[in-house]
Structures are given as structure tokens and as C-alpha cells.
């Protein structure tokens, strides 16, 4: 039986789940386009979807903010229908073998700072800045970075008076410990500075492949958070950023120097990385590592196919000397008559056994991935492309998914 939401959206297969809500692929019947549909049971202990949808609506119109298409209740569920997005930066990081080039990190940093600035301009702090919560767009918006998951967002100032929330201590850790600011670990109320410090750790994660406080073992979650906090505080910024341009250390030092209610100088931080970008001689062509990887895979597949054909041609001439110099039609007829032979087991002396090339399934898969991945430069990567290279069964869950990736509310989110 066909399930519909809001009498306009057809509910498809489940593509993600989170701590409070499941995400489904859907179809806007009127517009014939795919959407993301997030469902939350109305009987859930702590309903969150309605609050999140209200924050999304306040953010509407901003660059890199997903569009809310419909919100309401349907049967036993609270529902939010949203624009469908592509894979998260965490998915793309895995796709690129867990290392981004400096160019890609700087291209991302520029947009990510702007997304955080926009949220702050709307009187909210995000409080869960991490790679899973930044997604690339689809189609013509394939180079645009989106920010998602406002499940932990909090208003930090009054919209009319701009009165800042008061300084508090003894707060529980909110967000993801890996990227949490030091003040968050210390139980201090979060403010704008903490979102930006978290982004600094995300950028170094992209540079390094992992952070020094990853993989720490502990008996309880609380003890693990304490170990992460200790390691983070005992790792000097200069040590964390060693081997990378000084701008990354400058960025983190700037964020840590901010007072609780300070307004960050977003333009200064953006310009810091833009100057580095230009000094490196990079071009703002928005060709990210995943685009280059696609091109490389496509070329490799084409080269392998060409080499295969050449080997077949050489083999054919070796087996049929008389074919040399004949027109292609004649050689085809000759080959056709000679190949009608009884099928007998090949022996080790048969050159056919050793030299007949067979298409490499992995390479062929890469070629197909590439054809889907890139219809011009640069474009987005779809989740089906990601899963052809690796297992991406993990879902982030706050918001909008791609065909396999969600944009989501934390379940893998609140670590």
C-alpha cells in the first residue's frame, strides 16, 4: 500500500535513523522530485522534531541551509519534509581514503565559516559542529556546503535586544566529544566561540586523518570524555598543527582567546585561509578531492579498457599469423571460422589460458561510478558512488539524506 505524507509526498524506503527520528527517501508527487522525510513518533519521551523544524524555518533563505518543504503530523508521527542533499563530509572523507588535500580543506573552511556565521546571525549556536553535519548539495548545487542538524542548537541571545545568555558553569557536555571545545569539556556554557573552535578541530581532522584524542579507551562514557578532555588540553596547538601552515594554529589560538560573549571576527578568519589559498597558487575552481578522484578513476578505467583491447588484438595476431595485414572484415571472417573448435580443457601450454584478458570487475565498477559521479567538472558525489568504494552503512541522522546518506540528528551524532 502506498504511504503518503501531507497528501503530497510518497514515503519510500528508510535510509537512516537517529536517536529521535527515522529518515526516509520520499517523492514529491506534484513536482516529481525526491525529498527527505524525517519521522518522529508522537509518543516519544522527548519530542524534538517540532523544535528542530522551527529552527530550520528561522534559518530559511540562507546559503547552505536546506529547504523545509512541509511540516506537520501524520497519524502517529511528527513529520518534516526537506530538500534532499548529497553525502556528508565524513562520507566524502572516507571516500577519499581519510585524507583531504590542503586545497580541499581550505575550500571547505571558507564555506563552513560562513555557514556558522549565518547561524550565529540568526541568534543561534549550533553546538554540534562535525563532518557528519555538513553535506554537499546535489546537481547544480553539488559544490555548495550545507549545514544540517539543529537538534542541539540553542539561542544564545535575544533576537530583539541581542542580550547575550549568562555565563554558566557545571554544564554537561553537549555535542560530540571529539570536536568539543575545551571550555565545553570544562562544563562552561557554550557560545559562538565554541562552534568555531570545534570547526578548527574538524579542519585539522581533515588535514591529519585523525585527532590525537581519538581511540582512547575507558570503562564509562564519562571517563572517556575525561580522557579526551585531558589529551586535548595537554596537546599544544602548535603540536596539533605541526607540519601544516601556521594559519591553522593562528585560527585555533584566535578561537581560544575569545571571551564568552565576544562576537568572533568571521571575516578575519575567512581571510586568513583565503590568503593562504592564494599564496599556495590554488584556483577557486571548486574541484574538490572527490572530483579529482573521480577523474582519476575514469581515466584509469579507460586506460585499462584500451590496454585490454590492445592485448586482445596482439593475441589474435599471435594465434592467427595470416590475419596480419587483412582488412578488418576479412580478419573477422577468418577469426570466426577458426574459433569454431571443440571445447577442450586448456592446458598449461595454451597461451590462451595465460594471456586472454578478462575485465577487472573492480575497475569496471570504478568506471561506472565515475560515469555517474561526474558529468562535467566539478559535480557532486552520490551516496551510491560512495558505497561502491566502501561500506557506508553508517548514517548520520539529523536531517537530510542522500540516496544512502542522511543529514542527521545525532545517534552516531552524540558521541
Swiss-Prot record:
CDD domains: STKc_CK1_delta_epsilon. PROSITE patterns: PROTEIN_KINASE_ATP, PROTEIN_KINASE_DOM, PROTEIN_KINASE_ST. SMART domains: S_TKc. Keywords: ATP-binding, Cytoplasm, Kinase, Nucleotide-binding, Nucleus, Serine/threonine-protein kinase, Transferase, Wnt signaling pathway. Disulfide bonds: none annotated. It comes from the Eukaryota. ATP binds at residues 15-23, 38. GO terms for biological process: endocytosis; non-motile cilium assembly; positive regulation of canonical Wnt signaling pathway; positive regulation of proteasomal ubiquitin-dependent protein catabolic process; regulation of circadian rhythm; signal transduction; spindle assembly; Wnt signaling pathway. This is Casein kinase I isoform delta. Induction: Constitutively expressed in retina. Gene3D superfamilies: Transferase(Phosphotransferase) domain 1. Residues 9-277 form the Protein kinase domain. Residues 380-415 have a biased composition (Polar residues). The keyword Cytoplasm applies. It holds the Pfam family Pkinase. SUPFAM superfamilies: Protein kinase-like (PK-like). Monomer. Interacts with per1 and per2. Component of the circadian core oscillator. It comes from Xenopus laevis (African clawed frog). PANTHER family: CASEIN KINASE-RELATED. Residues 341-352 have a biased composition (Low complexity). Residues 301-315 have a biased composition (Basic and acidic residues). Autophosphorylated on serine and threonine residues. Its EC number is 2.7.11.1, 2.7.11.26. GO terms for molecular function: ATP binding; protein kinase activity; protein serine kinase activity; protein serine/threonine kinase activity.
